[in-house]
Amino acid sequence: MFTQVNTAISRYVNFTREELDIFNSLLYFKQIKKKTIMLQKGEKCTFDAFVVRGCIRKYYIDENGFEVILQFAVENSWISDISFSDYETTGSHVFIETIENTDLLIFSPETKEQLLVRAPRFERAFRILLERHLAVTQNRLLHNITCTAEQRYDDFLQKYPTIPLRVPQHFIASYLGISPEFLSKIRTRKLKS
């Protein structure tokens, strides 16, 4: 179980066995059933979660009442609400929900602080993870502005090749910022070509 998260985090820093043991000792394993809301809008996010198995979505509800998916998290990826900080008092602006039965390795802000004190090189790894997340978010924003819906769908398939087999089509449409009907037309055109 820890092999997955150790491999993922060691891509950024070559940790010693002792550092990884400290990291592993601060994580806890949690199984969550599908369709479980892990974070509600307005709540404080109290976890960083590594997906061992399963699929999760992060979304918000727009002014018209539509769900807008911001992120999918599948195996070997992290999910949290980084938009919320201890300096804000409004709480989270998003929901985090499991799509499938999901196995997670989780740590709280307190255990993350303990980790950074006991194994300071993890700060570099988390900084790199955050920078990568910001780059992905920026690229997605640029794609939404500059690319056609079909180009965005192609990019989505490259980034998340297994998601179309795991989630309803309307979730993918929401992520792409298009209607399910328009996504269906794109998929039909692709099948014909």
Indicate residue ranges for each PLM-predicted region.
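Glycine- and acidic-residue-biased ligand/ion/polar-headgroup-sensing regions
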Residues: 35, 46, 50-59, 75-76
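Short phosphate-coordinating micro-motif centered on Lys-Gly-acidic
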Residues: 38-43
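Hydrophobic/aromatic-rich structural module bridging two neighboring secondary-structure elements via a short loop
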Residues: 62-70
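Cyclic-nucleotide recognition modules
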Residues: 69-127
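Phosphate-/nucleic-acid-contacting segments
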Residues: 147-193
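Cyclic nucleotide-binding regulatory module and flanking cytosolic helices
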Residues: 1-28, 84
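A generic structural motif
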Residues: 59-61, 99
